[in-house]
Amino acid sequence: FSPKVQYKFEYDVHNGQVLDAVIKWNFAGNWNLWFGQTKMPGNIERVFSSQKLQLVDRSLLNKYFTLDRDAGFQLRHKLNLGETFLVRSKLAVSQGEGLNRKAWSSGNSYTGRIELLPFGNFTKKGDYFASDLKREETPKLMLSVTYDYNDNATRQGGQMGNDIAGSTRDLRSIQADAHFKYRGLSFFGEYANRVATDGDAVNDLGEVYHTGSALNLQGGYLFKNNWELAGRYT
């Protein structure tokens, strides 16, 4: 009904579940409010769509530390500083338990992410796919930090992992990533750390939360004939 209101719906036919069901409202200038279930503003590798990965799967860092998808609200803003410098900020309050949870949440997740693009936007949203498919004519860089606090997490990784039957923990996650592209060359690096703030990572029933640290480094070079040499260290 209005170009200021958009929606996205994505259904996983294979597993029979809703992935995205979100409404996006551009309510003022560079401010947007999202409501529904969608990807959280977390590590950059998870934000890449499955069809836009550089390798056949995501890393072990993503497996254990991603915020994945969740249901709730997201407030997003972008700010231009000078001719090229772009700052994007994202805040989220979500149920903290991941995809398609029908029971009432026992505690919420609070997330903040800031993205700095000193050389301006990537070509055609190139910051959200891994390879330099657009062969950036000038260097492009994104530096980002994410903070998440999951209150009374009922799954091993907050939004991911097995359900917790015993005593729960509050989880604090910090993530940082960098993404660079220039003339076929691409690189991104990610760091993640998660701790349980109110007790050991192992609860009274011996259930283990996904805590600790991880590092993921990935890069490649796309030749002009569209063959690419790429690798990863995690």
Region annotations inferred by a language model:
Residues 105-107, 115-119, 123-234:
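Detector for outer-membrane/organellar transmembrane beta-barrel domains
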Residues 1-99, 103-120, 139-142, 211, ...:
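Outer membrane beta-barrel
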